[in-house]
Design a protein with these regions (language model features):
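C-terminal functional extensions of proteins
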Residues: 2, 239-348
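Metallocofactor- and cofactor-centric catalytic cores in central/energy metabolism, strongly enriched
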Residues: 2-9, 14-18, 22-28, 33, ...
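Active-site gating loop/helix substructures
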Residues: 138-197
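Conserved phosphate- and dinucleotide-binding cores of soluble alpha/beta proteins
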Residues: 2-11, 29-34, 39-61, 179, ...
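Glycine-rich phosphate/diphosphate-binding loops and the adjacent beta-loop-alpha structural elements
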Residues: 83-112, 198-205, 231-237, 268, ...
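Short beta-strand segments
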Residues: 18-19, 42-43, 134, 196, ...
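Electropositive, gly/pro-rich neighborhoods at or near active sites that engage anionic ligands
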Residues: 45-164, 321-328, 336-347
């Protein structure tokens, strides 16, 4: 169907996006054009960079991934947007971003981290809602096919390259971490659940490991879609196909967690692909038959872009295709004609 939503965003569907890192924030930038009813459920397993420093010094959950989502959904003047992204270059604050420090300050003022996130959301007048998947202090442990293991999200990639084998499983420590009740409620009320692109083992899967998340997804009648990465990731998914990504997600949750997977079929400049290959990454091969054998339908669309030599999802195209999938499903379920649903179209 050659369509995409053109309804007013305030009347858009209730969408939950699950993930972390730049993949989730990229998705959110596009989704806000189509619906105001967005809930981002964000991993808090990060322990590197400026987030890791604040986590260690202040005993708070890492703010970085949540800050990225704030930047994507904020409705502020350009100067405020610049301020959020400003990173100190020298002195004791070198490497820290103002956005991280703002969230850290709010965490000191307000009783809980999720309240601090809500407070920052109000300050920035964000579209939708951002929720940490849990407010508990969690770490990520990776176990490898050769029997070795390591603790710490920020060291998994380098350790994997040393071991030269695949990641077998990741776990949260403690394994008893409970999901934020608001996250469970959002999933249960969602009309569409999107597993965002991003680091498979360190951004997406950690959300699924928090107690209550997978059960809530299983109970939900929402349309569930995985937006697969475009390129493999050095230090995590070298050599992975689309079905390998899906299998990893199912192995850390349950078979049939979702039945649709959106992949990119747009072409990329060979010069860019070659540069990725030199760094140990490549375009993810879509082994459609293997995916279908797991009960997952592949939807392929041109959703990639190249920004400063980096392959990324085009936020507008990605959101547009996802909204089209939701609308098509709405038509089928309702048994309605296109005229009974707000018109939407795909631009060429």
């Amino acid at each position: 169907m050659e369509y995409v939503y053109q309804v007013a965003p305030e009347h858009g569907p209730r969408v939950v996006a699950i993930g972390g890192g730049t993949g989730l924030s990229t998705l959110l930038r596009g989704l806000k054009l189509y619906t105001k009813q967005i809930t981002a459920i964000v991993t808090v397993a990060d322990d590197g960079g400026g987030s890791g420093v604040l986590r260690q010094d202040l005993g708070m959950p890492p703010p970085g991934d949540i800050r990225h989502c704030m930047e994507a959904l904020a409705n502020v003047e350009p100067l405020m947007a610049q301020l959020l992204q400003y990173r100190f270059r020298e002195g004791g604050l070198a490497g820290q971003s103002f956005g991280n420090l703002l969230l850290a300050a709010l965490n000191g003022i307000l009783p809980t981290f999720d309240q601090a996130v809500e407070g920052m959301s109000q300050v920035l007048a964000i579209t939708g809602r951002i929720l940490p998947v849990t407010t508990e202090n969690v770490q990520l442990k990776a176990e490898f096919e050769n029997g070795t293991s390591i603790v710490g999200e920020s060291v998994i990639g380098a350790f994997k390259k040393e071991q030269n084998c695949r990641i077998k499983r990741v776990r949260l420590l403690p394994e008893t971490a409970e999901a934020l009740p608001a996250a469970i409620e959002a999933i249960e009320k969602a009309e569409m659940i999107i597993f965002a692109p991003g680091s498979l083992y360190t951004s997406i899967i950690p959300d699924l490991l928090v107690n209550g998340i997978v059960d809530a997804i299983k109970r939900s009648d929402a349309l569930k879609v995985y937006a697969c990465n475009i390129m493999t990731q050095e230090g995590e998914t070298e050599g992975y196909t689309v079905s390998d990504h899906i299998r990893a997600l199912f192995d850390h949750s349950c078979d049939g967690l979702f039945h649709l997977c959106l992949t990119n079929n747009g072409t990329l400049p060979q010069t860019v692909v070659e540069k990725y290959r030199q760094r140990g990454a490549e375009v993810i091969f879509c082994d459609k038959e293997s995916c279908e054998a797991m009960g997952v339908e592949i939807i392929s669309r041109a959703v990639a872009t190249v920004d400063n030599g980096r392959v990324r999802h085009n936020s507008g195209h990605l959101a547009r295709e996802l909204m089209a999938l939701h609308a098509e499903r709405t038509i089928r379920v309702a048994g309605a004609s296109k005229k009974q649903i707000p018109r939407y179209r795909r631009e060429t």
